[in-house]
């Protein structure tokens, strides 16, 4: 019994110590959230930001976790590097580039219909298709993206705004 008690006591103390050391105060959390909200607002107003995608939701089938995909808005250009799963109607032979392209933004609008987030509509034309990117970004940096194309099925993504990208600084 003594052999079991000491390791168990050490484990309980270690877990409780980690919880105490890592918790932030209410004031620290409020300051962090305000800083994140200000960084989101600044990125959207200047039109220079990156959204790292972590999950995709095809119109048919189940959602899939993804990594190393993103969209980036910089200097009036949308740099889209997104996976696509779904039906396509008119595409070049071989499938084309789908949602992987760099294209000038035709229309960019930002609205704030909610107190904790923004809606961004980005319209682009590529040589293959026309795309409407509807992006909802919350004050904490989480984002939801819905892509509608003329020649492909609608697809949705979720991700997070990259505040600390070295390329944006």
Predicted regions: what they are:
Residues 1-18:
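Sec-dependent bacterial lipoprotein signal peptides
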Residues 16-34:
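Bacterial Sec signal peptide processing site at the extreme N-terminus
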Residues 41, 68-70, 134:
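Short, surface-exposed charged micro-motifs
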Residues 41-56:
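A short, Trp-centered hydrophobic/proline-enriched beta-strand micro-motif
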Residues 48, 77-79, 142:
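Structural motif
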Residues 53-66:
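N-terminal post-signal-peptidase region of extra-cytosolic proteins
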Residues 67-114:
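Mid-length scaffold segments of soluble, non-membrane domains
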Residues 106-169:
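Helix-rich interaction surfaces within compact, conserved domain-sized segments
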């Amino acid at each position: 019994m003594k052999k079991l008690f000491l390791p168990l006591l050490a484990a309980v103390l270690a877990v409780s110590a980690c919880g105490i050391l890592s918790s932030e105060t209410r004031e620290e959390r409020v300051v962090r959230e305000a800083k994140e909200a200000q960084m989101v607002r600044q990125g959207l107003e200047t039109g220079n930001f990156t959204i790292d995608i972590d999950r995709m939701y095809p119109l048919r089938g189940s959602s899939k976790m993804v990594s190393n995909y993103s969209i980036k808005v910089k200097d009036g250009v949308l740099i889209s590097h997104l996976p696509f799963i779904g039906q396509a109607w008119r595409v070049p032979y071989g499938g084309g580039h789908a949602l992987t392209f760099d294209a000038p933004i035709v229309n960019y609008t930002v609205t704030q219909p909610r107190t904790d987030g923004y809606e961004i509509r980005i319209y682009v034309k590529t040589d293959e298709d026309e795309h409407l990117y509807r992006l909802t970004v919350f004050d904490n940096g989480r984002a939801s993206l819905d892509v509608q194309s003329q020649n492909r099925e609608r697809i949705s993504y979720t991700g997070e705004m990259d505040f600390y990208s070295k390329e944006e600084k």
